[in-house]
Amino acid sequence: MKFYYLTIALIVTLTSCDQPTATSAEDAEQLSAAGSEPTTDRGIHVDTYFGTDVPDPYRWLEDDLSDDTSAWISQQNTSTRSFIDAISLREDVKKTVARLLNFERETAPFFAGGTRYFYRNSGLQNQRVLFRETEDLGEQVFLDPNTFSDDGTVSMSGVSFSEDGSRVAYQLSEGGSDWRSIVIRDVKTGAILEPPLVDVKFSGIEWLSNTGFFYSSYDKPDGSELSAKTDQHKLYFHRLGTPQSSDELVFGGSNEEKHRYVGADVGADGRYLVISAANSTSGNRLFVKDLSSGNDEFIVLFADESADGSLLESDDNLLLIQTNKDAPNGRVIAVDPQLPDPGQWIDVIPEGEFVLNANSGAGFLFAEYMVDAISRVTQFDLKGRMIRNIELPDLGTASGFSGEKDQEALYFTFTNYRIAPAIFTLDPKRGETTLYRASQSPFDGNRFKTEQVFFNSKDGT
């Protein structure tokens, strides 16, 4: 077994503020003066389990509506506040943390309809803003969820563009609810094209060309949304310009198709619909439907939920799927939906020594491995032939390497103990990386040196 540690030549501490207002001794005096914490009464409640008495002296605190519990909470809050307020360095710590966190953040860009999009947070905004960038107009705010409500309680997620980039659909949540609506806009004019879809929960938005999209939800529960049981997820197809009541139920309408979570992916050529169905967050079944065949039959790829599987890319008539089926560290397989038997599966990226996280973009596959807590990224073609190992800026963590098949450049984010997250461009044909956006963090990583050191443990490993 390997052990390692990272040594840092210099250490930044919050007590290195410009003008600390009190010494440790002064703080200790003030904290002592703040007084001790209030006492908590012990009750006499006893439970008996299988003939054994189990005292539960604080059972009375479980009644959060009682006057005694309310009084106890008030006393605890008062005591805690007096303790915190007595820490004279607290304001300095607050200023330092605010200075280190209040800087502009940006995500790696993505493309839709040939237009570049990215998210940006100016520093302390509640929600990041979606921007678009064109050669003639430069950067423009495209969607700003901070303006969707006066009190900031409406959030945006799941932004998804149609194939040609002319339409965008996104989900809105009010007050943190899992029940959401889907809004559809015209990208050029910004106009909302139709009434929002409602009562959507735990859903993606997967477009089929420019005609409409697949989404998932449960039947609207009777009574409380917070306590009602939702255990049969259903996949629908919404055709643009039609009412939600006319949406086609694609999967999940029968007992045989009953699952708690159902999602959809469409292959790059629009031919195959791949449905993931699961009853937990680990393991899923996979079904495929040939949208060009005209029949509603589902082809079963993963018959049970013993492993995870998800569509990564499509290549000719083959589906490239990342899975840990018979491969705990993960692998990428090619499956012909017309020959779905596992004996016909082809390893594209076989299981290796390290856990695999695969992405696709620009007509290539990128295998991301975590090796001794450091990212290693290898580029393959869609047939599984290794192209190169990607040279990263330093020892650290890289993520991204995904995009459309026709993209000429891909983007990834890199960070480590010294480098705040920065965005790099990868030329997938040459394997060259260049800095695209440096971090705006005020943290000066050049003051530090990071090393990775290995040593033998007591048992010699």
Question: Can you say where each PLM-predicted feature lies in the sequence?
Answer:
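Bacterial signal peptide processing site
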Residues: 18-20
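Beta-propeller blade signature
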Residues: 131-134, 183-188, 229-242, 287-291, ...
